[in-house]
Regions:
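HotDog/MaoC-like acyl-thioester-processing domains
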Residues: 3-5, 38, 68-69, 80-136
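Short, surface-exposed acidic-centric catalytic microdomains
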Residues: 39-43
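Short structured motifs
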Residues: 57-63, 75-76, 88-89
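Generic structural detector for well-ordered beta-strands
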Residues: 6-9, 60-62, 107
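Short, basic/aromatic beta-hairpin or loop at an interaction surface
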Residues: 47-54
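Catalytic strand-loop segment that frames the active site of acyl-thioester-processing enzymes
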Residues: 1-36
């Protein structure tokens, strides 16, 4: 089930064109993914303690509309795909008027402490990580 994470645009995130710099969206997406994982009950600290990590392997961002100072942004995060070693999140950033500022698909992989791809441990396959299409 999608989760919506809210944040407000801060002045230091603006570029010389007076809108959010494109690189800042990566920070927004990262923050929202970590909040998403917390909300769905994914124990990220436990995953690390057990010797695993989730690495971002690819990000595809489509910029649609400029976010500006003090805009209240809603970042919708959902799990799009889940395999044995990896998955993909879908993220949509909207302003308070509902206009889409950016859309992203973020692919990630599970690795062990040596950085080698690893199967996602069963205890971390919480319901929110499983895409809605796979639950049917």
């Amino acid at each position: 089930m999608p989760q919506v994470i809210e944040l407000e645009v801060r002045s230091y995130e603006l570029d010389s064109y007076n809108h959010v710099n494109n690189a800042v969206y990566l920070n927004y997406l990262e923050y929202a993914r970590m909040e998403f994982l917390k909300r769905i009950g994914f124990d990220y600290k436990g995953l690390i303690a057990d010797g695993y990590m989730l690495y971002v392997t690819h990000i595809d961002i489509r910029y649609k509309y400029s976010a500006r100072l003090h805009d209240k942004l809603n970042i919708e995060v959902s799990s799009l795909k889940l395999g044995k070693l990896s998955g993909t999140f879908r993220q949509i950033i909207k302003n308070s008027d509902g206009l889409i500022c950016a859309e992203a698909e973020v692919s990630w992989g599970c690795v062990d402490t040596t950085g080698k791809p690893s199967k996602i441990p069963e205890q971390y396959l919480v319901p929110g990580l499983i895409p809605e299409t796979e639950k049917q």
